[in-house]
Regions:
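Short hydrophobic alpha-helical segments enriched in small aliphatic residues
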Residues: 14, 18, 27-30
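Hydrophobic N-terminal alpha-helices or hydrophobic patches in metabolic proteins across all domains
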Residues: 33-350
């Protein structure tokens, strides 16, 4: 075949007019059966690398703009009824998701490279791996240096819970609870929704939904309880499958038998079903006892202050457990990347 000629996949019609039409469409990137998975893997990989080298500040301009938008809508529509929460959720989520999807579509029509860079940027802004890991790392370092007061101070800054006179074991336990949930919401949940056909719009949908469920449910003078109901329910549905896939990943890369046992028998000890799956499986995978509180649902802080006793799997939490948690999360990240790479290779050779 001459250099520069269009080579069509086998199985396409061979008529002269049909071949010319398909060649033109392939040249214009209108038919791209293989580029999407390839873009997904490499954009996630590059975004992870960039995020590790240069962590995104929580006060970055994009988040500040979104936060202003979300709070403005909430302030204007919160009239104390659930239907107002639905309208507010749609008014915040739809514009951002549609704009991200439209920009991706337009860039892809212009250049595959531009679309790829847009994907990397979106994943980078939605991941937030380092937005919580620095708290975890600082607590770990403080405990390794026997600086318990400093560890209490950092934990309080991160979670807002009362850490006065908190013993080391409790500091580690609270840190693990928040780290397990945060690793899912900032990494694996974003992965799942980005890999779906929605692509960057899916990642934005997950990140915004998580923020609205958390932010709008925070008590405040200008916030009613009914207003946040839809946001919490919407995120519960959106996070149902990802949370269970993350729990399965923890089980695969950790103590599988204990993780599955805890998942099956102790999930209900946690008030939020999705977080319960994560924390029960994470507890078993780590071999660490995490308490299962009976507190107000959908509150991450409430998960950490219950008094119903530890799960009947694993050992007491110690500073060494924090290092085990780091290994567990990174092994789970590698597992997800391997699966995505296998999908990419399968599409390549098909």
């Amino acid at each position: 075949m001459p250099a520069g000629a269009c080579e069509l996949p086998s199985g396409h019609c061979t008529g002269s007019h049909a071949r010319l039409t398909l060649c033109y469409r392939y040249a214009k990137n209108d038919i791209t059966p293989k580029t999407a998975p390839r873009m997904t893997f490499f954009s996630v990989l590059l975004a992870l690398i960039i995020e590790q080298v240069r962590a995104l500040s929580p006060s970055n301009p994009v988040f500040a703009l979104f936060q202003f938008h979300a709070e403005t809508v909430a302030h204007g529509l919160d009239a104390g009824k659930q239907k107002h929460g639905l309208l507010a959720w749609l008014a915040v989520v739809l514009p951002w998701v549609l704009i991200v999807a439209l920009i991706y579509f337009l860039l892809y029509k212009v250049s595959f490279v531009l679309a790829f860079l847009w994907n990397v940027a979106v994943v980078y802004f939605t991941l937030g791996f380092r937005q919580f890991s620095h708290y975890f790392t600082d607590i770990h370092l403080a405990l390794n240096n026997d600086d318990v007061p400093r560890a209490r101070e950092i934990l309080h800054e991160w979670t807002g819970i009362d850490t006065v006179d908190m013993p080391v074991g409790e500091i580690v336990r609270h840190t693990l609870i928040h780290a397990v949930v945060a690793s899912h919401r900032h990494v694996f949940g974003v992965f799942f929704w980005y890999v779906l056909p929605l692509g960057p719009a899916g990642a934005v949908l997950y990140r915004i939904s998580e923020y609205l469920a958390r932010s709008w449910s925070t008590p405040g003078e200008d916030r009613t309880a009914a207003f946040s109901t839809f946001a919490q329910r919407a995120f519960f549905v959106i996070d149902w499958i990802p949370s269970r896939l993350t729990a399965l990943g923890f089980a695969i890369v950790g103590n599988f038998e204990d993780a599955i046992y805890a998942w099956r028998n102790h999930t209900r000890q946690w008030p939020d079903p999705n977080d319960g799956v994560l924390l029960a499986a994470g507890s078993g995978a780590l071999g660490a006892r995490l308490a299962g509180p009976l507190a107000e649902p959908s509150s991450l802080d409430a998960l950490a202050v219950g008094d119903s006793g530890p799960l009947t799997v694993g050992d007491d939490c110690t500073p060494r457990t924090l290092q085990s948690a780091v290994g567990l999360v990174w092994r789970a990240v590698i597992l997800w990347m391997i699966l995505l790479l296998m999908l990419t290779l399968a599409v390549w050779v098909s």
